Amino acid sequence: MIEDDMMNYTDDGVPESVFNAFGWDDPVVTTIAAGHINQTFRVALGERNQHLCVLQRVNPIFGPAVHYDIDAVTCHLQSRGLVTPRLIRTTKDELWFLDEFGALWRAMTWVDGENHTSAESPELCYEAGKLVAGFHLAVRDFKYKFRNERLGVHDITAHLKRLAEALDEKDYHRLYGEVAPLAEEVQNRLGKLPSLEGLPSRIVHGDLKISNLMFSPEGEGVCLIDLDTLAYMSVPVELGDAFRSWCNPTGESSADSEFSTGHYAEALRGYVAGGGSWISAEEIEAIPTGIETITLELSARFLTDALLESYFNWDRKNFSGAGEHNLYRAKSQLSLARSLSGKRDELRNITQEIFTRGD
């Protein structure tokens, strides 16, 4: 039976039915290693392989309905003159294809550019901020009800509840002695931060790690990719998650993370230069809090996952278990949160100065 199933796959692990669904003859398929969620391929078509597109096997955490959202938002972005990948319909005029094995596939137009795994320089942060501001500005007045709702993604109360439950249920876990005091610190720090509730809910990308931004070879922002996470959210939460990632030069895999105010200032300058100054005064004021809140939220989530041994991308080469890897990630984020805590006044001053001056 296994041999029969494999007969339907190409050398790249793509069922022939997928190529047929999109009407592709003799495609040249190359695996793109970047990304942990969806399996991504570069497809070259035509006699000289001159026509390129992206093919993705969509992770089961996303249902087919997400493609209605991607199509609607990218259509709007295109109408506003922004560069964006667009979904390619099947020969049956559908936005996705479900293969005979139950896997969900989609194809998208190819956008020339490159991405980065980390923000190596303040200059890159400037271009990233400018690109994100253009996106936020373009969807500012777009009225749309998402079919794929991402509920509880940044629900701090829910994440802390899960952490408390994990501590109660896993007190026998080999890492409990290390996790418990860190969890207490996370809870105490979060309890002292201003609430982000009540801020305007706006359409956002939802996952602005630097690898989800495309740049030209000259370093200019081109477009946002990986649009499965489109949702309504507050801008300080969106930017908080972005700046948490961009402004950590040591990378998220470092145990001793330090927040770079230089990277932050350039990211904000880029955001303002890209048209981001339209957000409200309360949103501007909440940006530094958003960074610290999301950093602590991730710490809580990783501590929970350490006790639950939950990590689909566990690095078996460097960690003896998923728990150990998650504990390392939690320590990295908590280190970053401590750095942020010590720079609150500086971050607040930088934020107000840049938005006031409009630079």
Where are these regions (language model features)?
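Secondary-structure capping and boundary motifs in well-ordered enzyme cores
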Residues: 100, 124, 200, 205, ...
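Conserved ATP-binding subdomain of kinase catalytic cores across diverse folds
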Residues: 31-46, 50-53, 58-161, 235, ...
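Small/polar glycine-rich anion-binding or flexible loop at a beta-alpha turn
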Residues: 284-294, 320
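Active-site acidic catalytic loop and adjacent metal/ATP-binding pocket
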Residues: 36-50, 54-55, 87, 188-237, ...
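Juxta-kinase regulatory segment immediately upstream of eukaryotic protein kinase catalytic domains
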Residues: 2-30
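Active-site catalytic-loop/activation-segment of kinase and kinase-like phosphoryl-transfer enzymes
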Residues: 2-6, 148-194
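ATP/Mg2+ or Mg2+-diphosphate-binding catalytic cores
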Residues: 166, 297-359
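Active-site activation/catalytic loop segments of kinase-like enzymes and analogous catalytic loops
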Residues: 236-277, 293-313
